[in-house]
Amino acid sequence: MRKVILIILIVVVIYFFTCFFIIKEGQRGIILRFGKISYDDNHHVLVYKPGLHIKLPFIESVKIFNSKIQTIDNRLDSVLTKDNKNLVLNTYINWKINDFCRYYLSTGEDNIYYAETLIKQKFNNRLRAQISHLNIKEIIFNVKDQLTSNIKYSLNASSKINYKNVIFKKAINGTSNQNINQENNLLQSISDLSEIGVQILDVRIGKISVSEDFFSLICSRINSEYRAIAKHYRLMGDKQAEELKLRANYEVVKILSKAQRSALIIKSEGEALVAKLFSDAFSQEPEFFSFIRSLQAYENIFKKKNQNLIVVNENNSSFLRYMYIK
């Protein structure tokens, strides 16, 4: 009898404790009655806030969700711009669950993988579509303004689709290819994130960089531009050097011509002065002038070596008359 009472007491205690459940801060919960979501009298889903709550054991079960703001780090490679440039974008998305019933029905027992996959897929598609109409300059100036605002608004746009028809089934014993294809088709069928009970709070582009191929192309283009600039300056330098050389040669020729002209003028003036002095001096002594000129002629004749000199003795020769003076 005691054993029966003890067993009954244990069952009562277990039953009593299974009647209560606790929702922690930052969480929300819904009641599943025989695996189906329970509603109130107004056919609204019962969402339980943090605190201690009561349920029917073995009939009702609790599904708890994270109600905090969650962040997805996302990276997009090869995003093509309007001017055909490939960019690499590092982005992040802040989101939270705002409709726990939709979220449960859509993601299949709070499978966060499907939710994040869908959020990233929709965000990436819209971001690529937006960037394809902008060049790099417009993207940089619109990163914190219209670009992210448009994407956020489009992701949160309301839809008239019946969310109860959008249900992801979770494979218990592994995931078959058929289930994966069904899930991918469902992902494509959802036009905005409100259909799965998710709200996008903020989207941001943290970093914009170029792909490796585009970076190499930029470096090659910069090198080509600098080589062209260097070649241009070298050509300008060679041209200026040639102009300076021609100008210097012209100045040299001009200065030399001027100097030679001055020298010739001075020389001619000096010769004229000497001739005048000789003329004035010899006009006073014509015989002495004739004697000096004859001596100069003798010097020019007799100073030559290795030559035979034949002298014709003529007493009446005016050239040799000073050689016969006794």
UniProtKB/Swiss-Prot annotation:
Which CDD domains is this protein grouped with? SPFH_HflC
**Main site of residence?**
membrane
Top-level lineage group: Bacteria
Q: Keyword Transmembrane helix on this protein?
A: yes
Q: How does it sit in the membrane?
A: Single-pass membrane protein
Does this UniProt record's set of keywords contain Repeat?
no
Listed under GO cellular component are:
membrane
The record, for Pfam families, names:
Band_7
**Where is this gene product found?**
Membrane
Sorted alphabetically, the keyword list is:
Membrane, Transmembrane, Transmembrane helix
Membrane-crossing residues? 4-24
Subunit composition?
A: HflC and HflK may interact to form a multimeric complex.
What is the purpose of this protein?
HflC and HflK could regulate a protease.
PANTHER family recorded for this chain? MODULATOR OF FTSH PROTEASE HFLC
- Family affiliation: Belongs to the band 7/mec-2 family. HflC subfamily.
- NCBIfam families from the xrefs? hflC (TIGR01932)
Question: What protein am I looking at?
Answer: Protein HflC
Protein source organism = Buchnera aphidicola subsp. Baizongia pistaciae (strain Bp)
What lineage is this protein's organism placed in?
A: Bacteria, Pseudomonadati, Pseudomonadota, Gammaproteobacteria, Enterobacterales
